[in-house]
Amino acid sequence: MNVKVENIEKNVVKLEITVDSEKFNEAVKKSFKKNAKRFNVPGFRKGKAPLNIIKKYYGEGVLFEDAINFCCEDTYPKAIEENNIKPVDYPQIDVVQIGEGKDFIYTAEVTTVPEVKLGEYKGVEVKKVSYEVEDEAVENELKSMQEKNARVSLKEEGEIEKGNIAIIDFKGYVDGKAFEGGEAKDYEIEIGSGTFIGDFEDQLVGLKKDESKEVNVSFPEEYGREDLNGKPATFEVTIKDIKVKELPALDDEFAKEVSEFDTLEELKSDIKDRMKKELSEKAKAEYEEAVVEAVGANAEIEIPKVMIEKEIENMVRDLEMRLKYQGLDLKSYYEFTNSSEEKVKEYMRETAEKRVKTDLIMQEIAKVEDIKATEEELKEKAMEVAKQYGQKDVEKTAELIANAQKAYLEIDIVNGKVLDLLVESSKEIA
């Protein structure tokens, strides 16, 4: 095998790879062995015609497609390894010379990992991030707990008031016609919750059980459905029942009922402690992100478009998986958000570019600092991931993960170590 390397443009190289005729003939024989059964030659049972007859009957090129694949699969990986080329995508293969008794020559054009010029990455100055737990936040959490533990009962007499729950039948019309999704029976709505569009809920205040009313509202301009965006609508509404919510008193008895604590003050203290922990984790994550951004601002990288496109595809696949868990698919997501595949991908582009840049910088720092993942760390990370799957045999699952996802585990561990280095060496400023 002979290899010539030519730099076509920044981050794009073309390899001209020559496979000697003997090796190519072996690939042709291998192709014949694979495809022999599909050839039908008069005078021979199907699949029994010898190689020389097949070539004569079908032409020598009939076996070239698989022969080319065999040659490329064997020589391309060796060529990029020997020439220290790190591709980021599949190569564009073009045949230069092919024929019986000739050397097989092909070119492979491929985009490579870009050069990363690191600036200062140790000791970057980053503004301190901190959060305080507000008393209002604690009170809001208590109110939420009150709501969850409210007693709901039928309101036998009287009108709908704010805070009541109305059980309604409704049917909506736009331009005088009923529209899809605009009808429901025995629908529960809390008055004042803002669940419905416009002042729909306010217009129900004062109605009694079994009364009906025509409610007029307008859909928001960006409601998410082209047939409804910004349009006025009329709803025929009938009150089936009215319920009233009775909130429990915020006292020691409430604390005992909803928690492990004996007093309301103990419950408040626990809520505050949990919020402090959450805000501390939030501050830590934001500080780490700011450190990485500062390091990124000091670096110079010209990211190939193909790397960004690949990351966008990964993000779309992740979105598709998350939607699947919710019983949805991409098509319904695009319809619900009044979007499209093109719009979503464009929205993801900035984040994708940021992710690619961060990964490249982390890899370069790891290389400069000689940061690697140890076998022990790989085992620990695999065990950590395995526990998340909830399998009975955690150790066996961890072993499978360590083998199947070793490269991903290594990247995760190394990136974590690099992040620790960057954060520990950073300077926190007020």
Swiss-Prot record:
The keyword Cell cycle applies. It is an enzyme of class 5 (isomerase). Its EC number is 5.2.1.8. GO terms for cellular component: cytoplasm. GO terms for molecular function: peptidyl-prolyl cis-trans isomerase activity; protein folding chaperone; ribosome binding. Keywords: Cell cycle, Cell division, Chaperone, Cytoplasm, Isomerase, Rotamase. It is found in: Cytoplasm. Residues 163-248 form the PPIase FKBP-type domain. PROSITE patterns: FKBP_PPIASE (PS50059). It catalyses: [protein]-peptidylproline (omega=180) = [protein]-peptidylproline (omega=0). One of its GO terms (biological process) is cell division. NCBIfam families: tig. Consists of 3 domains; the N-terminus binds the ribosome, the middle domain has PPIase activity, while the C-terminus has intrinsic chaperone activity on its own. Belongs to the FKBP-type PPIase family. Tig subfamily. Involved in protein export. Acts as a chaperone by maintaining the newly synthesized protein in an open conformation. Functions as a peptidyl-prolyl cis-trans isomerase. This is Trigger factor. It comes from Clostridium botulinum (strain Hall / ATCC 3502 / NCTC 13319 / Type A). The gene is tig.
